[in-house]
A protein has these predicted regions:
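Walker B catalytic acidic pair
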Residues: 11-12
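S-adenosyl-L-methionine-dependent DNA methyltransferase catalytic core
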Residues: 1-6, 15, 20-184
Length: 184
């Protein structure tokens, strides 16, 4: 495969298997670099990036946590009434909700830590949740945008479920901007 462009960028999850990682490296003719979006935002999103763009890997890491991207006045519709169990405010996942669902969807995040990777979710109880003043609530679409370092309301104009999915499928803007700096 020959690429005649000035630069290319390919991304995949850091949890991918070694066989796939090597296959991509062989196809693209370069090894991946590892960057976690948590170095640039309040979201842990470990990824491999393959690129022919020289990337500075010695950079100042962001100390931003979930609390820094939260809205101050959130509509009551985002709050849950399910009982909380295992509350421990010293942990990143500081509580779980008592309802039927996959364990990942029961997790309540401490706002003083970074949140785990955003995933595609269309609604229901699948959005990331935060513990605020003794209550659990789902993150808002605006907060999802902020975790991806998008401008506020960038995904506005479509249903909330689509906004969550778009953010879960997207790249973290500040990571991509950092990678592309060398092209400026």
């Amino acid at each position: 495969m020959k690429c005649n462009r000035n630069g290319f960028l390919f991304e995949n999850v850091a949890s991918m298997n070694e066989e796939s990682k090597h296959a991509i490296s062989n196809c693209l003719g370069c090894d991946p670099i590892f960057i976690d979006s948590g170095d640039f935002s309040a979201q842990e999103r470990p990824r491999y990036y393959w690129t022919n763009i020289p990337v500075l890997l010695n950079y100042e890491k962001s100390k931003t946590v979930l609390r820094d991207v939260l809205e101050s006045n959130v509509d009551e519709k985002y709050f849950y009434t399910h009982p909380l169990i295992n509350v421990d405010l010293s942990k990143q996942v500081c509580a779980t909700m008592d309802f039927k669902n996959h364990d990942m969807h029961k997790r309540i995040f401490n706002p003083d830590f970074k949140v785990h990777t955003l995933t595609t979710c269309g609604g229901g109880n699948t959005q990331k949740k935060v513990y605020i003043n003794g209550r659990a609530r789902k993150l808002t679409p605006l907060e999802y945008e902020r975790l991806q370092t998008l401008p506020d309301n960038y995904t506005a104009g479509v249903a909330d479920g689509h906004r969550y999915t778009d953010c879960g499928n997207g790249w973290t803007v500040d990571v991509i901007a950092h990678i592309l700096k060398a092209l400026a």
